[in-house]
A protein has these predicted regions:
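Long, domain-scale functional regions
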Residues: 1-277
Length: 277
């Protein structure tokens, strides 16, 4: 549904009231018995650090930021998907193997965990992330249902350096299919991207896709056409692929432990859900 209309806001990482914007998360969905959250706004270097795959502040991309929904632009950090570990691999374009990514291992699964605090990290469970991805025509140019099948159910290991389609960790990023399913249901027939027709892809769904935030951001999914392409959402709202050394915005995603309970809140941005132990 539309950006602020879906009442799926959760306050996470603080007991401060009212909940600071930087602690707002949103419920992507319930998968089996696991609730999946994603950070509402893009991560800062204070949250994810200036080591790992940090490149620079997002404003230094000199990108189109006119679609950005919030007012925190100057603090948003931009990270490569997998570049700093080996800056010469694949002619310097980075690698699309998630298990070797410092964004994964340092920024998300070390710094985020340390900065969010023990009490809150205990509310997050380790999960199996589907990281094989698939080739361009099986995800980017497909509607949500087909993209989900090719991304989550039948990922591939083509061109990966570890021949794995799964990675176990607490923190990850959204899937392409998460983004696509966040739009109103009648938009699920759209392709992630159709090169010359915005009316047939997710550019025409931004006003009714609550996951769309207006900046260029990474997903967790490889584009398995080569060793260095990764799927991302661009500022116009469509799904594309780019080199893993590119530096984009980040929104950490994770699954809550079954022991976490609902305390209060209606789920609106101003009255987010408060969690208990």
């Amino acid at each position: 549904g539309a950006h602020d209309v879906v009442d799926n806001f959760v306050c996470f990482g603080t007991d401060t009231k009212p909940c600071p914007d930087d602690n707002l998360y949103r419920i992507i969905g319930v998968f089996g018995d696991k609730v999946k959250l994603i950070k509402y706004d893009y991560a800062t270097k204070e949250l994810l650090g200036e080591d790992g795959d940090y490149i620079k502040l997002y404003t230094e991309r000199n990108d189109n930021t006119s679609n950005y929904y919030e007012n925190n632009l100057v603090k948003i950090a931009a990270y490569a998907w997998n570049y700093k570990k080996d800056m010469s691999i694949n002619n310097g374009y980075g690698s699309n193997t998630w298990s070797t990514s410092l964004l994964n291992k340092i920024n998300l699964n070390t710094n985020f965990i340390n900065n969010i605090g023990t009490n809150w990290i205990d509310k997050i469970i380790e999960t199996t992330w589907k990281v094989g991805g698939n080739i361009h025509v099986n995800i980017e140019t497909q509607p949500a249902k087909v993209a989900y099948q090719n991304e989550i159910v039948n990922p591939v290991m083509t061109y990966s350096t570890d021949n794995q389609t799964e990675y176990n960790a607490k923190i990850g990023l959204m899937y392409v299919s998460d983004y696509m399913y966040a739009a109103l249901q009648d938009k699920w027939i759209l392709a992630g991207s159709i090169y010359n027709d915005a009316s047939k892809d997710y550019r025409s769904a931004t006003s009714v896709n609550w996951l769309y935030m207006g900046l260029v951001e990474w997903t967790i999914s490889r584009c398995a056409n080569n060793e260095n392409y990764v799927f991302y959402v661009n500022y116009g709202g469509q799904v594309n692929a780019t080199n893993a050394n590119n530096y984009l915005a980040i929104r950490p995603a994770f699954y809550l432990s079954n022991s976490v309970s609902y305390l209060s809140g209606s789920g609106t941005k101003t009255d987010p859900i408060i969690l208990g132990d």
